[in-house]
Each structure stands twice: as structure tokens, then as C-alpha cells.
Amino acid sequence: MDTSTVLEKYTQDLSNLPLEVRHLLEEIKSKDVQVSEARKRYQTRDHQLHKFIRTNGTLTKHPKEDQLYSKIEEDMKLVQKLQKEKILLANTALFLISKHLYHFETDIAKLERDELLPPLEHPIELTEVSKDEYAKSLNGFSDSASATPTPRNGSSATPVAETVKKIQKKKLSVKGASSSSAQSSSASRQVKRLRSEEIEDPLPYEGGSLAFNGNVAMSINSAADANGPNGEDADNNLYCFCQRVSFGEMIGCDNEDCKYEWFHWSCVGITSPPKDDEIWYCPDCASKMEKRKKKRKN
């Protein structure tokens, strides 16, 4: 690796990053508008009920009380759903930026160690804090899809910090359990999941940049020292619609020609593992198959 290779690599890797982050921020803004509208609706209905009580007393029931309460509950659930989606989008942006920043800093450090790049007069050290924040962003990203909204308080530094207060114990994904990414995709897709009770105490994996223990935490220190910036055994392939690396729980599409192959549960709206004999197609493949069926009928 030399300086020109690193420059070319990161020029290419970062070319789409601004557009990706901009798209994520626009999605968050759009959901913010939906949240605001839903809040106005249930607050208006709540005001109607309180106004009726002030006028007629608590013993007289509003003629549309049940209907109003049902609508209020519906809008509140919608707000909770949208807030979870906003957290997921924010963590996606954090993950993308953190990933590129970490690999860039480690590559620069390697070039300086090999004396291919003169050190800066005031070098930006890859501190323990930045490593911990990078690990936290990855773990927090996996948790955010299933996390319940947490009220903000004065002690929270950022919204992301609120979502990662308590790291849940994750199941080892089928993708992560594969011995090699080069295994036959048709064989690996036959096993959709690996139940958590079968791996109650998985052994830590220390060969690559990701070290899995009971909490699927990232051991950045040992990975950077042992195998360099990227890790020899790490699976750096990109999967799913979000085009990110494998993490958390994933499901494989049963279409052998699927260009994405594996999907994060949160990205395809899955909350529980499929049955062993259940066939599952990703939304993209399912849509294409449906279009082909319609063409045949016509």
C-alpha cells in the first residue's frame, strides 16, 4: 500500500458518501414532518375531550369518546414508529461516517509507520475515545431497530447516546456464523437462522476486525494491532439494500440470482425468525417475480 493507492481508494469510497448522508437527512426531515402532523392530530382530539369535560362534567360521556381515543392511540403509535425509524436513519449516517473515518485514520497511521508518509506536525491520534465511539456506533446501530423510544433528559449528550444506553445481547447471525463468505450461497440460504439457545455462550472471535463475544462487541484495539486496519479475516463485503457490512441478525433471499443476497432484519421489516421450511424473497426479488407473473397472464 502506498499514498497514491490510499488516495485513489478513498476518493472512490467517499464519492457517494455526501449523497448518501444527504438522502438520510432528507428522510429524517420527512419523518419529522409526519411526526409533527400526527402530534397535532392527537393533541387536537385530546383538546376536544378536555373541552367537553370542562363544559359537561366528568359524568357525561362524549358521544364520540371511544372513536377519539382510538384515533389518539393510533396516532401515538405512529409517532413511536416514526421516531424509531428516525433513530435508525441517524445511526445509519453515523455508521457510514464512522466506518470511513476509522479506516482512513488507520491507513494513514500505517503509511506513517512504513515511512511512506511524513507524520503531521500535530498528528490526530486515533484515541481510545474515537475507537470506543466507533464500536458504540456499530452496536447502537444494531440495537436501534428494536429499541423503544427513550425520553430525552438533560444528561444525554446526543440522541444516539440515548439509543445505546443498554446494549442488548444479540443472537449470532447466520451470515456471521458462516466459516467463509466464499461458501455456496445456495447451501447457506437453506439455513435461515441459528437459534440463540444453540449458542448461549459463543466463543470470542479474534481473527478479524470484528470480535464477537456474548454482546457482539467490537474489539477494535486487538484487531488493529493484530491484522492491520481492515483485518485479514473480516468480511468486508456489502450486503442488503443499505449496502453495509454484515452485522446483527440477517436473512438470506431464496432467489439464487438476488444481487443483495443477505439482508439486515431491520432493513426488510423482519422482527422474528422465519420457520425452517419457509421460503423468503426480498422485496426487490418479490416485486420482479410479481411483474413477471403479470406479464405471463397478459
Curated annotation (Swiss-Prot):
Family: Belongs to the ING family.
Single GO term (MF): histone acetyltransferase activity
Family matches, as Pfam families: ING
Composition bias type Polar residues, residue spans: 140-158
Disordered, as annotated region: 140-206
Name recorded for this polypeptide: Chromatin modification-related protein YNG2
InterPro entries: ING_fam, ING_N_histone-binding, Zinc_finger_PHD-type_CS, Znf_FYVE_PHD, Znf_PHD, Znf_PHD-finger, Znf_RING/FYVE/PHD
Organism: Candida albicans (strain SC5314 / ATCC MYA-2876) (Yeast)
Binding-site residues, Zn(2+) 2: 253, 258, 282, 285
Residues in PHD-type zinc fingers: 237-288
